[in-house]
């Protein structure tokens, strides 16, 4: 619709105007009657409305249509009309390699790859992440392809410089085809860096063209999309549109003839190519009428005359009839074959569809040879029944372009290929054989786990049953059946084996063989499983322990995702158990039986045991679980960090049923949960950080000893003294009711040592009383086994401490130090050892380093040196100190919040401890300032009191009486206030502002202060008591006597109250005898000596000196009723 103002000059209008002119009288001015077209259908103008103005709505509609028809800014930037605001990113081959590999891996089957445009905004956002090689690919593969084109196009200098491309076009001439010589000369002039990138792009393009039946991208289409990016013209060139034709043809020529242009470029065969030579020949036959498909046996010219590339010398000449350049077949056309041609030394032919001969004239065009020109120079020995031209798939070459026939006996390869293609397995892709792909497909079919991100997948063996009970049962059955004959045993075994289900026997035999073949499994465990199989008949006959004494190993897949841990049963191929990362409480690794570990569910308290063939799989599994817990902490910050614990699972659980760590009983779980609420872990209870005596007393109604747990195994760490002859640990099976003193005597009896010189302590140094039994500390109720230290009083640090030689890294922080030998505690976590070592060497940031064991294993922060054999196998070792290499995350969206949360937690923890220290220091300063202020005010009051005697001496007799009377009333009020209970409580609470000394403990020696107490109040006297006790002089005694006389007079005059008026009662009171001598009054009111004594006592109370300590005020390590005291008294 035309919206411009126009005048309607129709024929009828002209006739009407001429008639009006004829009838108009002369002298009148003629006025043309113009008709204005309508601006909008909504506005109605009459013919008489001359020069009407359009409305605002019509103008707005016109402008909106004009603005909507304008191209977008991105289109203008893409067409080089506007200059892009984005700065180009430096071209790097490493990034080109990453992008091309991703496209070759995921985008070969994408229809219209590089041709279909993605989201411009998403492409720009993805393109801006190209500053580093650690990029995260988007879901849409078209965005990746668009970003690759944008990355090459936005460079300030193209891959082929402008001058070189202009000279290349001038050599071809006007409308001339791309020749082999011209393109080879151009590639030889390009810099090696740019040439390497061009080869990588051509390789990706060839691989995509080989899959053109799926992605619909042949060599011509790839030339169209890559031509403007590789061969660019100047933006200001007048022939920019004509030059675009040469850029597209050049890329297509490079793709089709890459073997001749780039002889060193090798492109692998992926096995998923879909193009065949037959399809390419049919396409060329349809596009070029002068090409005929061979249907009969043909003989071509010699290879020397057909392969050599020759340039056309008569492109512009007149006489010879030259057809356009025939499209060469790309390398992807040799996907399948039907016959195997044999090279012929020389032959003649009338037509050659590959080389591009003209049938009418017989001349050969000046085109570079295609990859099929090598095959075109051959002749077949048999008649071709089909139109397929086959290739050899068993050649030693890595590229199908170099496939040449090997031997005439390989002519029957067609039958073999047909057999292979008929197999259903040949139609399957590589990912179809991946168990991770199958499990992810299984999850996608579910409703709640459809969007789970899969991290890792592990194949392990799940242990069903109890290894410890099997060990105990097999030992008892072996002794009971030792007198039986071998024939009876074999018959019973064979009879019971038939009754056993086949599934259990097969799983046991397969899993047990894997255990026996694994050399790293402990020998006792192997014997244990073999004995369990041999005694299966006896186990089945025992109905009470049938379920508890059978151990089965079931193959299970553990699939770890971003939110959950899935357990897939391989027998039923279904999800058996789902464990969220937030419910995973702990993972424990057995240090004796390599490959055995357990996982504890924090909600259901279900403990599952697993076995892996390679112990290194456990490290990978633990890392994935720790990563999942760190992500779960982002939403629930109350979760604790997951750390694997390493200790002997089977040995520490002996007799406990193997259901818990550290040998604890199932009945004691409420006790450990109650301690966990107070911040104590199971390790703290095991090491004796908690006062076990108080714990057992508090939970005595739960911790009830049973007769089965009377005998427990206790391991003692012995001191490094010559009497023990190099033995550092020893285990005993003891009764839980045995006293500590008897145990010490038992240990020292064989070594012929004096028991009074030794003590028993926990791993953390808490002393066990000699008159207490181990059951009082929780043995038999909290633990089924325990670990204690035997301490020699002469050398208390010799137990559990060993010399370790640390090899230092060659970094500037250590200032050339090569090694350092120190004595460390073998049962202390490595993070404490590292902190002590770095503090001694004055090296900051001890958490930047980790220790490498003697066998090259990397130890964790919570590992102990006893787990690698220190103190068990050897008494000294060498360890290497190395700097940690922090990994780079592959998923910034998940890793960055996780690392940020860890760093924030560390900063908050350090800041909180610093705040606590500053808070305590501030309280100390405030208390000191308050005490200083009180002392200063006391001196001020003393200075004021010095003027009181002089002022009282200046008073008259009556004024003195009133002063004494007011002073006595004030004294009585103070005495009344002291008798009020609420006032006393307020005074007592004010004393508790200053923290008192901690209560004495029987385990640690503390100084007991003996301060004088008044009225049973406490160690600090009140100021009122100090004042009354110190200021005893005649003046105050006189005031007290006057008060007594007044009370007696009031009692004596009670009978005369009816005759004496209330207003005259004061006149009948006997006057108080007062001394009139001013000097005596000044002497009585001299409070200076009392005040000075008050200040002195205040200073003594504020600064309590402890330099002189009485020996009887120090507690002994052993209580009064201990047998140690009886032993010492007996010696005396």
Swiss-Prot record:
Residues 281-301, 328-354, 473-498, 507-517 have a biased composition (Low complexity). It is found in: Cytoplasm. Gene3D superfamilies: Rho GTPase activation protein. Residues 279-354, 472-517 are annotated as: Disordered. The record marks 115 as: Arginine finger. One of its GO terms (cellular component) is cytoplasm. The keyword Cytoplasm applies. Residues 76-262 form the Rho-GAP domain. InterPro entries: Rho_GTPase_activation_prot, RhoGAP_dom. Coiled coil: none annotated. It holds the Pfam family RhoGAP. The keyword Cytoplasm applies. Residues 302-311 have a biased composition (Polar residues). One of its GO terms (molecular function) is GTPase activator activity. PANTHER family: RHO GTPASE-ACTIVATING PROTEIN 68F. Rho GTPase-activating protein involved in the signal transduction pathway. This is Rho GTPase-activating protein gacE.
């Amino acid at each position: 619709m035309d919206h411009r103002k126009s005048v309607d000059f129709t024929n009828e209008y002209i006739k009407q105007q001429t008639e009006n002119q004829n009838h108009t009288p002369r002298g009148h001015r003629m006025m043309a009657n113009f008709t204005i077209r309508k601006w909008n259908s909504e506005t109605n103008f009459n013919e008489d409305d001359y020069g009407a103005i359009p409305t605002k709505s019509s103008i707005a509609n016109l402008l909106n249509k004009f603005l909507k028809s304008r191209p977008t800014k991105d289109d203008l930037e893409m067409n080089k009309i506007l200059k892009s605001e984005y700065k180009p990113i430096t071209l790097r081959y490493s990034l080109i390699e990453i992008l091309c590999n991703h496209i070759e891996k995921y985008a070969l089957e994408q229809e219209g790859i590089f041709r279909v445009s993605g989201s411009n905004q998403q492409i720009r956002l993805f393109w801006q992440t190209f500053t580093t090689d650690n990029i995260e690919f988007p879901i849409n593969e078209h965005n990746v392809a668009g970003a690759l084109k944008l990355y090459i196009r936005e460079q300030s200098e193209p891959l082929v410089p402008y001058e070189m491309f202009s000279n290349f076009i001038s050599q071809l001439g006007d409308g001339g085809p791309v020749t082999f010589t011209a393109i080879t000369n151009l590639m030889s002039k390009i810099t090696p860096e740019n040439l390497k990138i061009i080869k990588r792009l051509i390789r990706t393009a060839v691989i995509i063209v080989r899959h053109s039946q799926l992605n619909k991208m042949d060599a011509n289409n790839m030339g169209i999309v890559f031509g403007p990016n590789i061969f660019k013209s100047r933006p200001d060139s007048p022939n920019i549109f004509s030059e675009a034709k040469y850029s597209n043809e050049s890329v297509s020529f490079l793709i089709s003839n890459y073997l001749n242009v780039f002889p060193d470029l090798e492109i692998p065969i992926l096995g998923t190519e879909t193009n065949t030579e037959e399809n390419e020949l049919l396409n060329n036959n349809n596009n070029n009428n002068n090409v005929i498909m061979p249907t009969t046996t043909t003989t071509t010219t010699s290879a020397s005359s057909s392969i050599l590339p020759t340039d056309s010398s008569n492109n512009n000449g007149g006489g010879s009839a030259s057809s356009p350049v025939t499209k060469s077949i790309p390398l992807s056309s040799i996907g399948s074959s039907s016959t195997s041609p044999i090279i012929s030394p020389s032959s003649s032919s009338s037509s050659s569809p590959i080389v591009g001969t003209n049938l009418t004239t017989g001349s050969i065009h000046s085109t570079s040879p295609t990859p099929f020109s090598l095959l075109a120079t051959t002749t077949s020995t048999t008649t071709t029944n089909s139109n397929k031209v086959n290739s050899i798939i068993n050649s030693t070459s890595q590229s199908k372009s170099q496939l040449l026939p090997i031997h005439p006996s390989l002519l029957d390869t067609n039958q073999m290929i047909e057999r292979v293609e008929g197999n259903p397995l040949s139609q399957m892709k590589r990912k179809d054989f991946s168990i991770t792909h199958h499990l992810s497909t299984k999850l996608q079919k579910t409703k709640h786990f459809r969007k789970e991100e899969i991290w890792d997948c592990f194949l392990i063996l799940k242990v069903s049953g109890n290894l410890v009970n099997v060990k105990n049962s097999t030992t008892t059955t072996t002794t009971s059946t030792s007198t039986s004959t071998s024939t009876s045993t074999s018959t019973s075994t064979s009879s019971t084996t038939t009754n056993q289900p086949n599934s259990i026997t097969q799983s046991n035999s397969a899993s047990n063989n894997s255990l026996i073949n694994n050399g790293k499994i402990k020998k006792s465990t192997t014997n244990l499983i073999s004995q369990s199989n041999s005694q299966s008949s006896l186990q089945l006959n025992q109905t009470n322990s049938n379920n508890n004494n059978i151990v089965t190993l079931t193959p299970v897949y553990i699939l770890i995702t971003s939110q959950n841990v899935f357990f897939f049963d391989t027998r039923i191929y279904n999800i058996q158990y789902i464990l969220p990362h937030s419910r995973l409480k702990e993972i424990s690794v057995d240090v004796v039986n390599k490959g055995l570990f357990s996982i504890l569910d924090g909600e259901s308290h279900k403990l599952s045991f697993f076995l892996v063939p390679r112990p290194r799989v456990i490290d990978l599994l633990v890392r994935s679980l720790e990563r999942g817990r760190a992500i779960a902490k982002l939403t629930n910050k109350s979760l604790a960090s997951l750390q694997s614990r390493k200790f002997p699972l089977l040995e520490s659980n002996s007799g406990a049923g193997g259901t818990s760590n550290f040998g604890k009983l199932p009945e004691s779980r409420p006790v450990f949960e109650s301690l966990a609420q107070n911040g104590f872990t199971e390790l703290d209870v095991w090491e004796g950080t908690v006062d076990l005596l108080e714990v057992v007393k508090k939970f005595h109604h739960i911790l009830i000893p049973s007769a089965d747990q009377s005998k427990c195994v206790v391991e003692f760490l012995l001191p490094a003294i010559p009497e023990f002859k190099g033995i550092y640990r020893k285990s005993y099976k003891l009764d839980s009711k045995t006293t500590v003193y008897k145990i010490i005597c038992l240990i020292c009896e064989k070594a012929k040592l004096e028991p009074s010189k030794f003590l028993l302590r926990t791993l953390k140094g808490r002393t066990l009383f000699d008159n207490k039994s181990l059951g009082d500390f929780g043995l038999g109720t909290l633990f089924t086994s325990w670990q204690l230290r035997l301490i020699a009083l002469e050398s208390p640090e010799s137990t559990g401490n060993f010399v370790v030689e640390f090899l230092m890294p060659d970094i500037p922080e250590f200032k050339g130090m090569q090694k350092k030998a120190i004595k460390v505690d073998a049962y202390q976590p490595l993070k404490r050892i590292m902190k002590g070592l770095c503090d001694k060497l004055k090296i900051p940031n001890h958490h930047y380093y980790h220790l490498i064991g003697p066998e090259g294993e990397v130890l964790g922060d919570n590992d102990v040196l006893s787990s690698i054999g220190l103190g068990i196998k050897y008494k000294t070792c060498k360890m290497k100190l190395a700097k940690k290499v922090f990994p780079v995350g592959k998923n910034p969206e998940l890793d960055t919040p996780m690392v940020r949360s860890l760093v924030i937690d560390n900063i908050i923890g350090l800041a909180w401890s610093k705040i606590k220290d500053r808070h305590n220091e501030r309280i100390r300063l405030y208390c000191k300032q308050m005490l200083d202020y009180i002392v200063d005010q006391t001196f001020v009051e003393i200075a004021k009191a010095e003027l009181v005697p002089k002022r009282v001496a200046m008073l008259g007799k009556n004024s003195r009486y009133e002063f004494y009377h007011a002073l006595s009333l004030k004294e009585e009020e103070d005495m009344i206030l002291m008798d009020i209970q609420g006032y006393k409580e307020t005074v007592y609470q004010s004393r508790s502002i200053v923290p008192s000394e901690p209560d004495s403990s029987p385990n640690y020696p503390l100084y007991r202060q003996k301060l004088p107490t008044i009225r049973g109040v406490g160690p600090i006297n009140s100021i009122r008591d100090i004042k009354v006790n110190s200021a005893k002089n005649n003046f105050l005694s006189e005031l007290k006597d006057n008060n007594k006389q007044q009370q007696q007079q009031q009692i004596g005059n009670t009978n005369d109250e009816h005759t004496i008026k209330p207003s005259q009662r004061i006149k009948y009171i006997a006057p108080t005898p007062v001394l009139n001598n001013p000097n005596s009054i000044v002497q009585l009111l001299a409070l200076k000596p009392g005040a000075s004594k008050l200040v002195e006592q205040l200073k003594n109370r504020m600064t309590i000196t402890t330099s002189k300590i009485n020996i009887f005020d120090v507690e002994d390590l052993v209580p009064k009723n201990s047998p140690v005291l009886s032993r010492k008294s007996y010696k005396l």
